[in-house]
Amino acid sequence: MGEPAFTSFPSPPVLGKLKRNMMPWALQKKREIHMAKAHRRRAARSALPMRLTSCIFRRPVTRIRSHPDNQVRRRKGDEHLEKPQQLCAYRRLQALQPCSSQGEGSSPLHLESVLSILAPGTAGESLDRAGAERVRIPLEPTPGRFPAVAGGPTPGMGCQLPPPLSGQLVTPADIRRQARRVKKARERLAKALQADRLARQAEMLTGG
């Protein structure tokens, strides 16, 4: 008896090399989540940025400055608001009254003293002219003319200008006198600044 003939079956055609994923399932899931997030970030980055301040500032904002040419956008109710004032500093400045070198309260300068300081030789003449013109003024008001108001400007005063100060001689005594005045004024200013600083510190301590 002969040997049975060997029958071979043809193998199916191989379409490609089979690939097997060696990555664990948990790691593969994490990789898919990471890739999905990266894809969403790329899609969001490609869009134009959104102005988040448009929902806050609905009107154009202008800077407020004290200049006549500036136009500030404001509401109708803001027109009647008053500017804030520093009341404490204002009261301290009111308490600081001008005083003389002896510490006494100084009164306002009169016209005669001002003229004597500016031009000692012409003070009496200008006052005499002013007195003469005051005598000429009629007591009863005339048509088209009003009498001088009490406390107002007196006719004739200020019309006579003093001569220039270049013709006056400055002596060493005048220089020393002026230096003493400047020194006393600086001392008063230093005392006032020190009092203001102490008052500010007291306000900060009481307010805090």
UniProtKB/Swiss-Prot annotation:
Cellular component, GO, one term: nucleus
Spans traversing the lipid bilayer: none
Highest taxon of the lineage: Eukaryota
Molecular function GO terms recorded: methyl-CpG binding
A Gene Ontology BP annotation from the UniProt entry: DNA methylation-dependent constitutive heterochromatin formation
Similarity comment: Belongs to the MBD3L family.
Note from the entry: The MBD3L proteins are encoded by strongly repeated regions of the 19p13 chromosome. The exact number of functional copies is unclear, and some of them may represent pseudogenes.
The protein's name: Methyl-CpG-binding domain protein 3-like 5
Natural source organism: Homo sapiens
Gene coding for it: MBD3L5
